[in-house]
């Protein structure tokens, strides 16, 4: 059973009035009601999260800074009630191993006066030293060269700061002496610069300057950059592409159909006789998934707009619609293509390019949603040098090691040389246990996680009969855990998913934490099930009785905003093959698709209560929750 109690959910989009996509409906809403509803939402959000005080991000999101509907941002917390953060004086040399981001050395003892430099080394030392239960982090930014891996040996540890903000970054920081910016094109008001940063051992898949994302060179442009929503804009209309039909089915691995007609498993009370049986198809067009199995490749899928999964295999674009083409070398380009009706967006690499016809044959990709179509919807092309024509864009020439940046400043002003970071790692902290040997009672307190690289081209699977596909990966990854918690943490500018709860997990708690500017989902949870006789696909069957799935997850008193920047089929919280989740007292806004998504009814016992959720489906169609 899914319980949704006292949750204020409003589907809104960017208009002057509290927005609704249908203008005729929006115009019918009285201005007075619209304004009072916004003010009520602001007050409710502050009531849920008094720690946010003025809660300016919520205030701006509700457009309460407008003249037509204005409210002053005031904190509900009186100054006398504001308790400053205090250092935890229970953390001492006796019970902690200390780490320092700039003054540490892994040859040191790990004391407060002789700290280590590596969080991993500190965790390992604490795990093997009697009486050590804290990894104490001095303030600063820790640039990880490798993922922190926590196993059952690290059970019982607490990671927290001791003297200020602790930032854990998956990025590679470019030093000032690596950035000898030289003018590339600064004529006629342009401001494009280039620096030779060398051929990198890590793939350059993103760029952050001053803590904010730059936009990979693309067409159409995004006027205010990737972090500012265009809503339905900044795309080419799908009708401006001549879509190449899907690859013929007979050229793909043969489809194997499986339908479970065990009477004990038959669901015989559904409308229109939909979803009576557990059904899957293996391989065929679903060979793009990992595992290569999906309900939407089964013999007779049912549901709204139901038909077997397929995607176009390429597109031809008239140069008048792609004015900077034909391209000299689009081998590293990517196409971002909405499925018609905007249920999900596919990403494709380029397999072949014919510059005479401007035909792009798609290569790897197209697995970022479970529902297909023969043609593409609205789309854009990214990571092409010829499209470097707008402030805030960049392009990395991997063949020559050259980084080009169109600096958003007056012509002749070079880009900064400080705080220039290449997001690199996909996972910052990996909790790696099993159902029989779990990672237990690890706590993360007050840590900020930033700068992971995108994962939308990583393998995706279809979790269940809903129309989602997911990449089983996140900046924080949990598999095989019990009672792991995150309290007061910040997840910011992560290009993939924020937290991913995979397989066996019990009592994961995320509380008093904030997610912002996330490339995929803020939090995703996806369990495993087993095959049944004749199914022959582990981790994709109907049997969930072995307990290899998340239960009793709690997301409490947290915020999530500006998510799904890259992969549009993303939510503040999504779950599949997960049970008994509690979402309480959260504030979620500004997302491209449904705010909260249960991809199936596995297990039941979920409770969604006392949340504020709005500005969902900002880029897409259908539901808000």
Range-by-range predicted roles:
Residues 13-14, 125, 608-625:
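Short, intrinsically disordered, charge-balanced linker/junction segments flanking boundaries
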Residues 100, 138, 160, 169, ...:
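Residue-level detector of conserved, well-ordered beta-strand and adjacent loop positions
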Residues 152-154, 163, 204, 345, ...:
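Parallel beta-helix/beta-solenoid
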Residues 1-14:
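Cleavable N-terminal signal peptides of Sec/SRP-targeted secreted and luminal proteins
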Residues 17-480, 485, 490, 531-547:
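Extracellular polysaccharide-degrading/modifying enzymes targeting complex plant/algal/animal polysaccharides
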Residues 146-147, 426, 453-459, 473, ...:
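Short glycine/acidic-rich loop motifs that flank beta-strands on beta-rich extracellular proteins
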């Amino acid at each position: 059973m899914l319980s949704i109690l006292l949750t204020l959910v409003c589907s809104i989009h960017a208009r002057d009035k509290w927005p609704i996509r249908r203008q005729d409906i929006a115009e019918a809403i009285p201005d007075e009601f619209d304004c009072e509803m916004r003010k009520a939402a602001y007050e409710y959000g502050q009531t849920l999260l008094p720690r946010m005080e003025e809660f300016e991000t919520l205030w701006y999101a509700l457009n309460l800074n407008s003249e037509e509907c204005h409210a002053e941002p005031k904190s509900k917390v009186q100054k006398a009630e504001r308790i400053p953060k205090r250092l935890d004086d229970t953390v001492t040399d006796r019970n902690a191993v200390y780490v320092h981001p700039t003054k540490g050395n892994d040859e040191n003892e790990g004391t407060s006066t002789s700290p280590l430099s590596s969080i991993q080394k500190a965790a390992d030392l604490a795990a093997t030293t009697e009486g050590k239960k804290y990894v104490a982090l001095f303030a600063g930014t820790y640039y990880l060269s490798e993922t922190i891996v926590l196993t059952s040996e690290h059970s019982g540890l607490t990671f927290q700061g001791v003297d200020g903000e602790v930032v854990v970054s998956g990025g590679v920081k470019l030093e000032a002496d690596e950035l000898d910016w030289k003018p590339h094109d600064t004529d006629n008001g342009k401001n494009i610069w280039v620096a030779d940063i060398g051929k990198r051992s890590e793939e350059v898949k993103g760029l952050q300057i001053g803590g904010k994302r730059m936009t990979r060179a693309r067409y159409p442009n995004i006027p205010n950059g990737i972090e500012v929503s265009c809503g339905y804009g900044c795309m080419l209309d799908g009708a401006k592409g001549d879509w190449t039909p899907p690859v013929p089915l007979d050229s793909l691995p043969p489809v194997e159909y499986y339908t479970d007609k065990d009477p004990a498993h038959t669901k015989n009370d559904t409308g229109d006789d939909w979803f009576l049986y557990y059904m899957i198809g293996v391989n065929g067009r679903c060979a793009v998934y990992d595992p290569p199995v999906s309900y939407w490749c089964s013999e007779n899928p049912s549901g709204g707009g139901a038909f077997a999964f397929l995607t176009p295999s390429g597109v031809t674009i008239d140069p008048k619609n792609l004015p900077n083409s034909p391209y000299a070398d689009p081998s590293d380009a990517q196409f971002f293509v909405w499925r018609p009706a905007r249920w999900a967006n596919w990403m494709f690499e380029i397999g072949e390019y014919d510059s005479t016809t401007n035909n792009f044959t798609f290569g790897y990709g197209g697995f970022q949603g479970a529902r297909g179509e023969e043609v593409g919807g609205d789309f854009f092309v990214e990571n092409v040098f010829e499209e470097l024509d707008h402030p805030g864009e960049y392009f990395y020439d991997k063949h020559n090691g050259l980084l080009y940046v169109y600096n958003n400043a007056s012509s002749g002003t070079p880009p900064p040389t400080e705080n220039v970071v290449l997001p690199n790692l996909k996972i910052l902290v990996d909790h790696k246990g099993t159902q029989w040997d779990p990672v237990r009672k690890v706590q993360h307190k007050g840590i900020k996680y930033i700068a992971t690289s995108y994962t939308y081209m990583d393998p995706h699977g279809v979790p269940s009969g809903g129309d989602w596909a997911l990449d089983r990966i996140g900046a924080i990854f949990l598999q095989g855990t019990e009672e792991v918690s995150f309290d007061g943490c910040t997840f910011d500018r992560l290009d993939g998913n924020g937290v991913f709860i995979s397989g066996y997990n019990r009592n994961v708690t995320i509380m008093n934490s904030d997610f912002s500017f996330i490339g995929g989902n803020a939090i995703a949870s996806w369990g495993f099930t087993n095959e049944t006789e004749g199914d022959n696909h582990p981790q994709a069957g109907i049997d969930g009785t072995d307990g290899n799935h998340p239960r009793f997850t709690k997301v409490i008193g947290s915020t999530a905003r500006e998510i799904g920047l890259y992969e549009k089929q993303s939510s503040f919280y999504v779950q599949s093959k997960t049970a008994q989740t509690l979402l309480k007292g959260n504030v979620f806004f500004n997302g491209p698709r449904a705010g909260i998504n249960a991809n199936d009814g596995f297990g039941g016992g979920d409770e969604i209560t006392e949340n504020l959720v709005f500005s969902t489906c900002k880029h897409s169609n259908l539901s808000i929750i």
